[in-house]
């Protein structure tokens, strides 16, 4: 009986090891998983987000994030900011949803929802939902990025570190202690 159960279990495990995409989507115990745009659905990130008294469509085709080993999420997506004033459009290009506190470029950000943007002067800005600046930091230009996309999150150089990109402009992100 025990041998039969073990054989069935091994068959199920071998049959589920499937494609690299399936394996990439499944976090192993104790590991974080970087999420690509195709993995961020309206069940995780709403189609529309609230910011400065209006709602804007989230561009889930331009999204990225991290599912942490404990099941908590950090997600980011570009937004359609066409209904906002020029002053807000200059700063508000994307939206962050995070269930955990983050460190962005060394600055701590509590869990929550925020508007973000990359400014022409090389700064990255984080705003509360009322469009008030919380902080701004220097972003960096990654000329070595081979295939720049409008927004993505990639694994950083060390475990638990990530890079949030808008094209080739980026900031370092990690879960805060």
Annotate the PLM regions.
Residues 1-4:
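Positively charged n-region of N-terminal signal peptides that target proteins for export
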Residues 81-129:
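Mid-length scaffold segments of soluble, non-membrane domains
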Residues 23-86, 135-177:
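Primarily secretory-pathway and cell-envelope proteins
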Residues 7-16:
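Bacterial N-terminal signal peptides
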Residues 130-134:
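Structural secondary-structure boundary motif
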